[in-house]
Regions:
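Terminal intrinsically disordered/low-complexity segments used for targeting and assembly
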Residues: 1-51, 201-249, 298-300, 434-441
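Periplasmic alpha-helical coiled-coil/stalk elements that build and connect Gram-negative outer-membrane
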Residues: 3, 125-251, 365, 369, ...
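Small/polar, glycine/serine/threonine/aspartate-rich low-complexity segments that form flexible
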Residues: 26-38, 79-117, 228-238, 272, ...
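Amphipathic alpha-helical coiled-coil scaffold segments and their short linker/junction regions
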Residues: 35, 45-50, 178, 182-189, ...
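Amphipathic alpha-helical segments within well-ordered protein domains
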Residues: 46, 101, 167-170, 247-248, ...
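A glycine-/polar-enriched beta->alpha junction
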Residues: 47-57, 64-78, 98-115, 125-132, ...
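Amphipathic alpha-helical coiled-coil segments
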Residues: 58-70, 130, 134-155, 164-167, ...
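Metallo-beta-lactamase
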Residues: 200, 255, 422
Length: 441
């Protein structure tokens, strides 16, 4: 064996070792994230989030707060009881008095309760709106997972197919039937696809963690999804969104619009409360007094003897105190409440306009997104897959070059990713439509 041969063998061994070292580890495939039987469906994800998501649970406590304030507003003011004892220094006279004062709270209780009732209703509507937004967020995060998993499944298949082609070309090169360039071109393509696949795994992990967050789950909790992006989109396309034609009714039933209307009612109730608190009020009172009085001199008793001049006297009094609104009619609070009502009315008008615009835009987006999916699914996607299969078979028969296979494969990737974008657009459009309508699914 000459020196040139030995050098060649060393270089070949080095290349083989380098290629072996460059072999990627076994990354998770798309099946790692999908379980068609025991996985979490979209409906289950929404139900789980409505029950467990921490910020929604915190928002629900505001209803308890409002109900507690409602209970407090219905209570009458407490009566006042006073006790008084008077003693004469260096003497024997004394006086004991017990008084009771009872506020009548005229005109005020009903107004307080009316404000509190409307605040309870507003708190419930605020939670309902928070649920509406949470459902949309869960759908968005669930859709992110489905989108990335679909791309990952695509690259799983492409890596497997390209790997088989690479093995075939390597065998042909070893037999001398194919030029090494063809093998090297496929090797580069295989490494590119493997790199893209690894990136998709990272995106899938991140999307799954974000989904766990909106579900109220820890990042390390086990979670697999049940649905595929295509199944969800096609299922929702077959179902009719309950938007119908009555846009005005839909807008008025939305939780955020109703909450804005409730704020107008609260402001109106505050005006009534302020006006009633500016009226007169009456407190009734009563007291009992016992007086033990006398003089240091002695008097003559009926029997003719001397007796101390001292006696015990009992007094009972009753009356009423009236608060007269002579200068303070609560004018400032009434003016503030009216200004608050005007602001709440404008906020309600803005909420209705925003909801109307959101609904119209969501309907248009949903219609065109469904049409885009139909265009892809009615022929483009299947034809692209068929074209790739034909080119690959032609390559195996020696009718086309490896360049043709690589070109057609990249064209197929573009079509599949375009279909994924169309599916994702349709899913996001239906999410936006459901959010605009206020549907809980």
């Amino acid at each position: 064996m000459n020196a040139r041969t030995r050098v060649g063998l060393v270089m070949l061994a080095t290349l083989v070792a380098t290629a072996a070292a460059a072999q990627p580890p076994a990354w998770p495939s798309a099946t790692r994230y999908v379980d068609p039987v025991n996985g979490l469906s979209l409906e289950q994800a929404i139900a789980h989030a409505l029950e467990q998501e921490p910020s929604l649970r915190a928002a629900r406590t505001q209803i308890d707060v409002a109900q507690g304030m409602r209970m407090q507003s219905a209570l009458r003011p407490n009566p006042t009881v006073s006790f008084e004892r008077r003693e004469e220094p260096q003497g024997m006279d004394n006086q004991t008095m017990v008084s009771l004062e009872w506020p009548l709270d005229l005109f005020r209780r009903d107004a307080r309760v009316a404000v509190a009732d409307r605040q309870v209703a507003a708190a419930e509507l605020a939670v309902a709106d928070r649920q509406r937004l949470l459902i949309a967020n869960v759908r968005a995060r669930y859709g992110d997972v489905l989108t990335v998993v679909r791309d990952l499944r695509l690259f799983d298949d492409l890596v497997a197919a390209t790997g088989r082609q690479h093995d075939l070309l390597r065998a042909r090169v070893d037999e001398g039937a194919t030029a090494p360039l063809d093998r090297d071109l496929v090797t580069v393509e295989l490494r590119r696809l493997e790199s893209e696949r690894v990136l998709q795994v990272g995106r899938a992990e991140a999307a799954l963690i974000e989904l766990k967050r909106v579900l109220g789950m820890q990042p390390d909790a086990a979670l697999m999804v049940r649905d595929s992006l295509e199944d969800v989109v096609l299922r929702e396309s077959a179902a009719t969104a309950s938007s119908a034609n009555d846009a005005s009714r839909i807008i008025e039933q939305r939780a955020d619009v109703r909450e804005a209307a409730a704020q107008v009612d609260i402001a109106g109730a505050k005006i009534e409360r302020a006006e009633r608190e500016g009226r007169f009020d009456v407190n009734v009172f009563a007291n009992y007094a016992r007086m033990n009085n006398g003089f240091p001199q002695l008097g003559v008793a009926p029997s003719g003897g001397l007796t101390p001049i001292r006696s015990v006297f009992h007094y009972v009094a009753a009356g009423a105190t009236v608060t007269v609104p002579l200068r303070n009619h609560n004018q400032g609070e009434i003016a503030a409440a009216r200004a608050e009502q005007n602001g709440a009315a404008l906020t309600h008008e803005a909420a209705r306009l925003a909801a109307t615009t959101e609904l119209a835009a969501a309907r248009a987006r949903d219609d065109y997104a469904r049409q885009a999916v139909t265009i892809y699914s009615s022929g483009a996607q299947g034809l692209a897959r068929h074209n790739l299969a034909v080119v690959e078979q032609s390559f195996q028969l020696g009718r086309v070059t490896v360049f043709d296979v690589l070109t057609e494969r990249r064209r197929y990737i573009e079509v599949e990713r375009g279909y994924t974008d169309a599916l994702r657009g349709a899913f996001e459009a239906r999410t936006a439509l459901n959010q605009a309508i206020g549907e809980g699914r």
